[in-house]
A protein has these predicted regions:
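Residue-level signature of transmembrane alpha-helical entry/exit and packing/kink sites
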Residues: 73, 107-111, 167, 196, ...
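Alpha-helical transmembrane segments and their helix-entry boundary regions
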Residues: 17, 28-29, 140-142, 167-168, ...
């Protein structure tokens, strides 16, 4: 496990080394601010789930059917949230940066937009460790991390001619390219394949693409799309664009699932996680067991 975290730490800093070496301090500063916001989404959205999910998966490791059921539902909840956040930040990322950091960081906003498409997939990739650890295979996790690092580093080098924006896009491409192989490799010892992941999350991915495209079509060419300068204008753009996107997204998810099951699963997961953040209590029943 420690070896995996060591390799992962180097991978998470290689992009900074390459951008700083190839360009200049200003370019690195803009890139680093954009990356920090990108990484923050993973830590804020998946960290509260780590202990709950790992504990439940470990308890289910000797019951393959229960483990698969729990994992499928948990992946669905992560995808429900992650795909929405990723698509929405692709639409309003530059406005979020202008609101949080100020107008002088506009270049970071343009870089951050290229991280956006990878956020949802990054959240799914971050759950691969749950499988490796719950079935007692940390060595496989380390080996996969080394392969992942080699591929991602190669993409960074290939993307350098396009500047910091190219490196940001390389992150998104790497997550999208590796997510299915990552789950296939993690799930081999327990008979899970890449199709298991696809079946659990494809509706959320499709909903985010459709809702994002519809929202962009509505606002393209308007003053909102042109992102006028100013913190107040940025906040207004975020609120209007995100409201329209979320409406389309939730509606599409409900249509694709023929009902509100994803909303009930999300509510169940929130109930499971919330008590653990404010008080210690016995482990809750897995979210995968909700009817």
């Amino acid at each position: 496990v420690y070896g995996r975290f060591g390799v992962n730490y180097f991978a998470k800093n290689l992009d900074n080394l390459l951008v700083g070496w190839r360009f200049n301090a200003a370019a690195l500063g803009y890139y680093k601010k954009a990356y920090d916001l990108f990484a923050l989404s993973a830590s804020q959205l998946t960290s509260p789930l780590d202990n709950v999910a790992l504990s439940a998966l470990s308890r289910s490791s000797h019951d393959p059917d229960r483990l698969k059921r729990y994992l499928a539902n948990t992946l669905g909840v992560v995808a429900f949230i992650g795909m929405a956040v990723g698509a929405d930040l692709t639409l309003v990322g530059k406005d979020v940066v202008r609101l949080v950091l100020g107008p002088k960081w506009a270049e970071s906003g343009r870089i951050f937009e290229l991280f956006g498409p990878g956020i949802g997939v990054m959240l799914l990739c971050s759950t691969v460790g749950w499988i490796h650890l719950s079935i007692g295979k940390p060595g496989r996790w380390l080996r996969w991390t080394i392969v992942e690092f080699a591929i991602t580093a190669s993409l960074f080098v290939l993307a350098l001619p396009w500047g910091p924006k190219g490196v940001a896009a390389a992150w998104s491409v790497s997550y999208c390219a590796l997510v299915v192989p990552a789950f296939w490799y993690a799930g081999r010892p327990i008979g899970l394949g890449g199709s298991f992941l696809v079946a659990a999350v494809w509706r959320y991915a499709a909903a985010s693409l459709l809702a994002g495209a519809a929202t962009a079509a509505i606002f393209r060419g308007t003053l909102i799309w042109s992102s006028p300068a100013g913190v107040g204008a940025a906040l207004e753009t975020i609120m209007i664009t995100s409201s329209v996107f979320v409406t389309f997204y939730v509606g599409t998810v409900i249509l694709l699932h023929w009902g509100c099951a994803p909303l009930r699963q999300l509510a169940g997961l929130l109930r499971e996680v919330a008590p653990k953040r404010i008080a210690t209590s016995p482990a809750a029943e897995p979210v995968g067991e909700y009817k």
